[in-house]
Amino acid sequence: MCLTCLLALLIMSNPIIANAEVAGLVPCKDSAAFNKRMVNSVKKLQARLAKYDADTPPALALNKQIEKTKTRFATYGRAGLLCGTDGLPHLISDGRWSRAGDFVFPGLLFLYITGWIGWVGRGYLLSVAKTSKPTEKEIILDVPLAIKFMSSGFAWPLAAWQEFSSGQLIASNDDITVSPR
């Protein structure tokens, strides 16, 4: 009985069964709406380009932008991204490792950046708490001090692990106030 339940659970949760095309998503290179978006984007840029003489700085900039637009759309098409009926690429996070690069790297980068911001802010607040006017330094930032913390924040995962393993990261129970209720 338990083996049957386990087998049924494995079959139902198999990520290979999940098919994004069923949800109305198609590869961007095959999407008519995606190709229409590219054509419309290029047409708008070409309409702006027609207002300028050739070899002028605005015309050169617009030509460069047209090439970048074509390259961007071609890259999306080659990357195997899936597009919806709106012609926009959609990220799929259904557990297939073939789609992991679409969201794992940006997700890890987001966590790193938010951790950096939090670690730098924590360091700044702990530092200004030791000054004579900590509230004032929280409202009016001490920019040189903040820059010092910002420049050292890139190694925050190592610093956090070091403080955690030494016991400095977590406050002792005696330092935590408890409500009398």
From Swiss-Prot:
Pfam families (alphabetical): PSI_PsaF
Protein's organism: Pyropia yezoensis (Susabi-nori)
InterPro entries recorded: PSI_PsaF (IPR003666), PSI_PsaF_sf (IPR036577)
Main subcellular location: plastid
Keywords: Chloroplast, Membrane, Photosynthesis, Photosystem I, Plastid, Signal, Thylakoid, Transmembrane, Transmembrane helix
Superkingdom, natural source: Eukaryota
Transmembrane segments: 100-120
Lineage: Eukaryota, Rhodophyta, Bangiophyceae, Bangiales, Bangiaceae
Membrane topology term: Single-pass membrane protein
Localization: Plastid, Chloroplast thylakoid membrane
Protein name: Photosystem I reaction center subunit III
Record bears the keyword Cytoplasm: no
Chloroplast recorded as keyword: yes
GO CC, alphabetical: chloroplast thylakoid membrane; photosystem I reaction center
Family from the record: Belongs to the PsaF family.
Functional summary from the UniProt entry: Probably participates in efficiency of electron transfer from plastocyanin to P700 (or cytochrome c553 in algae and cyanobacteria). This plastocyanin-docking protein contributes to the specific association of plastocyanin to PSI.
Signal peptide: 1-20
Biological processes, Gene Ontology terms: photosynthesis
